[in-house]
C-alpha cells in the first residue's frame, strides 16, 4: 500500500519528500528511495540548498507539536545539524518556525514568531554560527530574491482547513527593495499560497475558481494565468529548482513543467510501514470512570473500556465495536458503554465478567451524558438533539422524556426506586433572551407525567435524590450577593450558589431542620403538584458548588474555590475542587478531600473514586478519607491497532463536522461527498501527522472559519526548549551585543527582563561572552546556550562597553512573549503621549479573552481620562469579551463631581470625553472582527488600518478524539444588522485604509499609529470640552 507523501522539493533529478514523519529522497532517474532522518520528531518542509548538497528542514516536536526548530543534513557527509534553538511556538493554525527562502548569498531565511509579542512570523537571516539577523520587513512566511528585487509572501502559508478563504489575512505578495520601497503586487480575492518563481513568472496556488489550482503572474503581478484544472484535491507544498515545479496532492507527489503545463504523477510506490500495534498508558488519555455495586471499577481511556479490581492485578478489556466514551455499571454482572461510530452513539450492554457484548441499542444521536438506575433496568442519556431519553435495558425501547429548544440536557438523576427522573431543563424567557436559564423538572415514570420542581427565573442544576426517594436536592444560582471589584467601579456575582432541598412526600420537611420526633407531622404519599412552592435552602454558606450527593446523615458538596480565570483559560487544565460534607444533625461542614477534578460515589455511599489533574485515579472510604489509595491503571496496557484507530478518528472528525456545522442543510448536502473523497486515503496513513493531513482537508471543505485541530498526541519525541531572557541582541564581530533590554511597566510583576533583576548591571551595548562558563560567539549562539535553561539561574558574563567584565546570575524564563508584548504596548503608549503632549490616551487589546480584558482595564482606568483615545486592536486574537469593552467605550461623560478639595471626578466614572480612533489590521479576528465592526456601527470614531481576518462563526468544542485532540466546528454564525452574514470570510473594511509596507518596519515607523495620532488630534480641534468652574 502506498504511503501518504507530502512536502516535496526538487533539485535536478532528485526529489525530497516527507513520509511517516521522516525525510526521504527519491531519484527520478533510477527510482531509488533513501531515508534521510530517523526519529527526530515530525519532519516537514524540506528544501535543497547550497547547490543541492544540503537540505534544510523543519522538525516539530512535543506531544502536541507545540514547538519547532530547523535542522540540516549534508548529503555528502551525512552530518545532521540543528540550526536553530528558538523552539518557535505553534498556534491553532500551526504557523511554526519555518524555512522562508534563501538570500542572494545562499543564506537561509527563517520565518518565526519566536521573538514577537504576537503569533505573527517575521523574517531573519540565519548565520552559519546560529545567529539570527532580523530583516525588519514585517510579517512574512516566504522570501525570494530575483533580479535585484525582494519578493515577500505575507500570510502565504498552506491553508487546508479553510478553503476559498477571502478574508484580510489571505496571502499577498509584496515586491520591491528597502531603498525604493515595496508594492503589493498580488492581492487576489482568494487566498494564495506557496509562491515560487520560475524564470519570469511567479507561480502559486489559489482557488479563485472554487478549487485549488496552480496560477501564475509576471514578476509585476500582472497577466494572471491558470495552468491546471484540478477538482478532487487541492495541490499543496509548491516548490521549485528554478526549472521544474513539484507539489503534493491527495497524498501523492507531482511534477509540473511550466513550459508546457504538463503535470506528471510520480510513482514513488510504498515507502515505509510501521508496527500496526501501539501501546499506551491509560492515565495519559483518561476520559471516564465508574464503580460497580461490588468491588470492581471501570475506566475509559483512548476510546477503550476496561474493568478491573482495586489492586489492578485483574483486568478485563470490554470488547466494543466502536469508540467508547462513557462506561456505567448496571449491576455486578453487567456494564453499559456509550459506543460511537460515524452514524452516532449507541448503548452497548456487556457481560462484566467476560467483556462480551450482549446487545446494542441505538444510534441515539451524539450522547453527552449517561446515568444508570440503581437496579440496572434503565439508562438515561442526553444527546446533541437536546433530548433526554429513557432506555429500557432489557428490551431496548427508547422513550423521549423531554426535549429543549435551547441546550443540552446533561444534568439529571434517577431515583433509587427507578420511578422518578429529575433533570435540569434549559429554557429562555423569550426567543431573543440573552441567557439560557435552567430549572428542575421531574418525570414520573409510573404515571408518565412531568412536574415543575422550580420556576424558570433562576439557574437550577445538579438534581439528586436521597436513597429513600423522600427528598430531591439541587443547586441553584439564586442567592445574589455581589462582591466588590477591587480594581474598577464594578460588582460581580461570584458566590451565589446554594444547595436546596424539596420534600417529595406529604409530611416531610427539610432534614436539616432536625424536628423533634414527637412533633413531626404524619408522613404521607407523594405530593408532586406543589413542589416548586416548598424548596428551601440548606444552612450552608454560598460557594461555587458544582454537585450535591445525598447521604443518610447529610450531603456531600463539591465546590471549586473562587479563582482568577487567567491561568485556567489559557492552560486548558481542569479545575480542582473540594469535597465537603454537611451534616444534618450538627449543621457543620467538614472538609473531606481537596485537589479533586471529578468523582463518583458507590451506591451504598461508603466509597469514593476520584481523579486529579495528573490523570490518575484514586479511592478512599468515607470513614477514613485521609487514607486514599491510588488505582494504578497504568498497570493495564492499551494496545491499539494504528489503522483501526485512524479509521475511527477519521470517522469521528467527519461526523463532528457534519453534525455541528451551523447550516444543517448545507452540511448534509456536502458531507457524504467529503467522506468518500478523503476516506480512501486513510489506509495510507501511518502516523498521526498523516491523519492530520486528512482531518484539516475535511475541515477545509466547509469553507468556514474556526475549523481547528488542537492538541492531540502526535509524538513521544521532545527536545529541550529554549530559555528566554527578554533581551534582543545584535551579532557583531563574533559577539552577541545587547540591543534592547525589554520591560513594560517596570513596577509590575512579570514585565521586565531578568537582566534588570540580576546583579550584572547590564546595559545596551554590552556583550554577553559566557553563559555557565561556556564561551558565546562564533562557536555557540546565545540561543543554543540557553536551551534547557528555562526556570533556572545561569551564570552570565558580560563585557561592558568600557571593556570591563562582570559576572552575575540571571533567572532564565521559559517564555518572554508577555514581556515583549508589554514592552511593545508601553513603547506605543509613550510615543502617543509624547507626540500629543499627553492629551491622547492609548490602549491596546491583544485578544478578546481574559488577557485582553486584563490589558484593557489595566490601561483604561488611566488612559480614558485624557482628551482623546486611540484604541488599538491590531493582532487581536479574538475571544468573547468585546461587548464588555464596547460597553465601556460607549459610555459618554455627562458631568463631574466637583469637590471642595481635590480634583474633578467624571460621571460616569472612567467615561470617555473626546474623540476616539480605532486601529485594526488583518490579524484582528473573530471577536476582534466583531469589535472592529461594532466600533464603526456604534459611531464611536473612525476605524483605520487594514481589513480584518473575517471569521465570525463561533465554536464550542465539547468532544475530543481518542488521543485528546480537540476539533472545533463552526457552530454559531454571526449576523449583523444591515450587513447580515457578510463579515464571515471577508472581514471588516476600515473607514480609512492604511497599509504597513515592509520598508516601514525597516525604518521602525508605524504608519498606522502615526495616522491615528494625526486624525485624533484633528478631531480634537473640533471637539468642545466643557468643565465646571472650580
UniProtKB/Swiss-Prot annotation:
Location (main, coarse): cytoplasm
Site residues, Transition state stabilizer: 927
A Gene Ontology molecular function term of the record: serine-type peptidase activity
GO BP: any one term: proteolysis
InterPro entries xrefs: ClpP/crotonase-like_dom_sf (IPR029045), PD40 (IPR011659), PDZ_sf (IPR036034), Tail-specific_protease (IPR005151), Tricorn_C1 (IPR028204), Tricorn_PDZ (IPR029414), Tricorn_protease (IPR012393), WD40/YVTN_repeat-like_dom_sf (IPR015943)
GO CC, one annotated term: cytoplasm
Leading EC class: hydrolase
Region annotation C-1: where it falls in the sequence: 641-712
Region (Seven-bladed beta propeller): 286-635
EC number assigned by the record: 3.4.21.-
Sequence segments annotated as region (Six-bladed beta propeller): 1-270
Cellular compartment(s): Cytoplasm
Keywords, in A-Z order: Cytoplasm, Hydrolase, Protease, Serine protease
Subunit record text: Part of the tricorn proteolytic complex.
Descriptive protein name: Tricorn protease
Gene: tri
Amino acid at each position: 500500500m502506498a504511503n501518504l507523501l507530502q512536502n516535496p522539493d526538487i533539485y535536478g533529478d532528485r526529489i525530497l519528500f516527507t513520509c511517516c514523519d521522516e525525510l526521504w529522497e527519491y531519484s527520478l532517474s533510477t527510482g531509488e528511495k533513501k531515508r534521510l532522518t530517523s526519529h527526530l520528531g515530525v519532519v516537514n518542509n524540506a528544501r535543497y540548498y547550497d547547490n543541492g548538497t544540503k537540505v534544510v528542514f523543519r522538525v516539530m516536536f512535543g506531544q502536541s507539536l507545540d514547538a519547532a526548530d530547523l535542522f540540516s543534513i549534508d548529503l555528502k557527509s551525512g552530518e545532521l545539524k540543528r540550526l536553530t534553538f528558538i523552539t518557535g511556538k505553534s498556534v491553532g493554525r500551526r504557523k511554526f518556525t519555518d524555512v522562508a527562502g534563501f538570500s542572494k548569498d545562499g543564506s537561509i531565511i527563517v520565518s518565526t514568531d519566536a521573538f514577537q509579542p504576537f503569533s505573527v512570523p517575521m523574517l531573519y537571516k540565519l548565520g552559519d554560527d546560529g545567529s539570527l539577523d532580523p530583516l525588519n520587513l514585517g510579517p512574512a512566511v516566504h522570501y525570494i530574491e530575483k533580479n535585484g528585487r525582494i519578493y515577500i509572501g505575507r500570510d502565504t502559508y498552506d491553508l487546508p482547513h479553510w478553503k476559498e478563504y477571502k478574508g484580510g489575512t489571505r496571502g499577498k505578495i509584496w515586491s520591491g527593495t528597502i531603498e525604493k520601497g515595496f508594492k503589493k503586487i498580488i492581492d487576489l480575492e482568494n487566498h494564495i499560497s506557496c509562491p515560487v518563481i520560475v524564470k519570469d513568472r511567479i507561480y502559486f496556488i489559489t482557488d479563485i475558481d472554487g478549487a485549488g489550482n496552480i496560477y501564475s503572474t509576471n514578476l509585476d503581478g500582472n497577466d494572471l494565468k491558470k495552468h491546471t484544472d484540478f477538482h478532487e484535491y487541492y495541490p499543496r507544498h509548491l516548490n521549485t529548482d528554478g526549472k521544474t515545479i513539484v507539489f503534493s496532492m491527495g497524498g501523492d507527489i507531482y511534477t509540473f513543467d511550466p513550459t508546457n503545463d504538463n503535470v506528471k504523477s510520480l510513482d514513488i510506490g510504498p515507502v515505509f510501514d510501521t508496527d500496526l500495534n501501539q501501546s499506551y498508558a491509560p492515565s495519559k488519555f483518561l476520559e471516564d470512570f465508574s464503580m460497580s455495586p461490588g468491588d470492581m471499577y471501570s475506566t475509559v481511556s483512548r476510546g477503550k473500556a476496561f474493568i478491573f479490581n482495586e489492586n489492578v492485578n485483574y483486568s478485563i478489556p470490554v470488547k466494543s465495536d466502536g469508540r467508547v466514551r462513557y462506561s456505567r455499571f448496571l449491576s455486578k454482572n453487567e456494564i453499559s458503554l456509550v459506543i460511537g461510530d460515524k452514524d452516532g452513539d449507541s448503548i452497548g450492554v456487556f457481560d462484566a465478567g467476560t467483556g462480551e457484548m450482549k446487545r446494542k441499542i441505538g444510534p441515539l444521536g451524539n450522547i453527552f451524558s449517561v446515568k444508570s438506575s440503581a437496579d440496572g433496568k434503565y439508562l438515561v442519556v442526553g444527546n446533541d438533539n437536546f433530548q433526554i431519553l429513557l432506555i429500557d435495558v432489557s428490551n431496548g425501547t427508547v422513550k423521549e422524556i423531554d426535549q429543549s429548544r435551547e441546550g443540552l440536557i446533561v444534568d439529571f438523576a434517577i431515583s433509587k426506586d427507578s420511578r422518578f427522573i429529575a433533570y435540569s431543563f434549559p429554557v429562555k424567557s423569550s426567543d431573543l433572551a440573552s441567557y439560557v436559564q435552567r430549572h428542575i423538572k421531574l418525570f414520573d415514570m409510573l404515571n408518565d407525567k412531568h412536574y415543575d420542581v422550580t420556576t424558570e427565573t433562576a439557574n437550577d442544576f445538579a438534581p439528586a435524590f436521597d436513597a429513600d426517594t423522600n427528598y430531591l436536592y439541587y443547586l441553584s444560582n439564586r442567592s445574589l450577593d455581589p462582591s466588590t471589584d477591587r480594581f474598577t467601579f464594578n460588582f460581580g456575582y461570584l458566590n451565589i450558589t446554594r444547595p436546596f432541598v424539596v420534600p417529595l412526600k406529604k409530611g416531610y420537611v427539610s432534614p436539616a431542620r432536625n424536628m423533634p420526633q414527637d412533633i413531626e407531622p404524619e408522613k404521607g404519599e407523594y405530593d408532586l403538584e406543589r413542589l416548586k412552592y416548598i424548596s428551601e435552602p440548606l444552612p450552608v454558606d454560598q460557594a461555587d458548588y458544582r454537585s450535591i450527593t445525598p447521604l443518610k446523615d447529610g450531603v456531600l458538596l463539591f465546590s471549586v474555590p473562587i479563582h482568577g480565570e487567567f491561568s485556567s483559560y489559557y492552560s486548558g487544565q481542569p479545575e480542582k475542587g473540594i469535597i465537603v460534607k454537611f451534616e444534618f444533625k450538627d449543621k457543620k461542614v467538614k472538609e473531606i478531600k481537596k485537589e479533586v477534578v471529578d468523582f463518583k460515589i458507590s451506591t451504598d455511599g461508603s466509597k469514593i473514586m476520584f481523579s486529579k489533574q495528573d490523570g490518575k485515579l484514586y479511592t478512599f472510604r468515607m470513614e477514613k478519607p485521609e487514607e486514599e489509595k491510588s488505582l494504578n491503571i497504568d498497570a493495564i496496557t492499551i494496545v491499539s491497532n494504528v489503522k483501526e484507530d485512524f479509521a475511527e478518528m477519521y470517522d469521528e472528525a467527519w461526523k463532528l463536522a457534519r453534525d455541528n456545522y451551523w447550516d444543517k442543510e448545507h452540511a448534509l448536502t456536502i458531507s457524504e461527498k467529503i467522506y468518500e473523497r478523503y476516506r480512501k486515503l486513510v489506509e495510507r496513513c501511518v502516523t498521526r501527522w498523516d491523519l492530520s493531513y486528512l482531518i484539516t482537508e475535511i475541515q477545509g471543505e466547509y469553507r468556514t472559519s474556526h475549523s481547528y485541530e488542537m492538541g492531540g498526541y502526535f509524538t513521544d519525541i521532545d527536545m529541550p526548549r529554549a530559555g528566554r531572557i527578554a533581551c534582543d541582541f545584535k551579532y557583531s564581530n563574533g559577539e552577541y551585543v545587547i540591543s534592547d533590554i525589554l520591560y513594560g511597566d517596570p513596577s509590575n510583576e512579570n514585565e521586565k527582563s531578568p537582566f534588570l533583576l540580576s546583579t550584572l548591571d547590564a546595559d545596551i551595548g554590552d556583550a554577553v561572552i559566557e553563559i555557565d562558563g561556556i564561551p558565546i560567539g562564533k562557536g555557540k549562539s546565545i540561543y543554543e546556550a540557553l536551551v534547557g535553561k528555562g526556570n533556572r539561574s545561569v551564570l552570565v558574563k558580560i563585557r561592558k562597553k568600557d571593556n570591563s567584565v562582570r559576572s552575575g546570575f540571571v533567572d532564565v524564563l521559559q517564555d518572554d512573549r508577555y514581556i515583549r508584548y508589554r514592552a511593545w504596548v508601553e513603547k506605543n503608549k509613550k510615543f502617543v503621549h509624547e507626540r500629543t503632549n499627553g492629551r491622547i490616551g492609548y490602549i491596546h487589546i491583544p485578544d478578546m479573552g481574559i488577557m485582553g480584558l486584563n490589558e484593557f482595564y489595566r490601561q483604561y482606568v488611566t488612559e480614558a481620562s485624557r482628551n482623546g483615545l486611540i484604541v488599538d486592536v491590531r493582532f487581536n486574537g479574538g475571544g468573547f469579551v468585546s461587548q464588555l469593552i464596547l460597553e465601556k467605550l460607549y459610555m459618554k461623560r455627562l458631568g463631574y463631581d466637583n469637590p471642595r478639595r481635590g480634583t474633578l471626578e467624571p460621571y460616569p466614572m472612567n467615561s470617555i470625553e473626546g474623540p476616539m480612533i480605532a486601529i485594526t489590521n488583518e490579524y484582528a479576528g473573530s471577536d476582534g472582527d466583531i469589535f472592529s465592526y461594532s466600533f464603526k456601527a456604534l459611531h464611536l470614531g473612525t476605524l483605520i488600518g487594514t481589513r480584518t481576518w473575517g471569521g465570525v462563526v463561533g465554536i464550542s468544542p465539547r468532544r475530543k478524539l481518542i488521543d485528546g485532540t480537540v476539533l472545533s466546528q463552526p457552530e454559531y454564525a454571526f449576523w449583523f444588522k444591515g450587513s447580515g452574514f457578510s463579515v464571515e470570510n471577508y472581514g471588516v473594511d476600515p473607514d480609512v485604509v492604511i497599509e504597513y509596507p515592509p520598508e516601514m518596519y525597516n525604518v521602525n515607523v508605524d504608519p498606522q499609529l502615526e495616522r491615528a495620532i494625526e486624525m485624533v488630534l484633528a478631531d480634537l480641534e473640533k471637539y468642545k470640552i466643557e468643565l465646571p468652574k472650580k
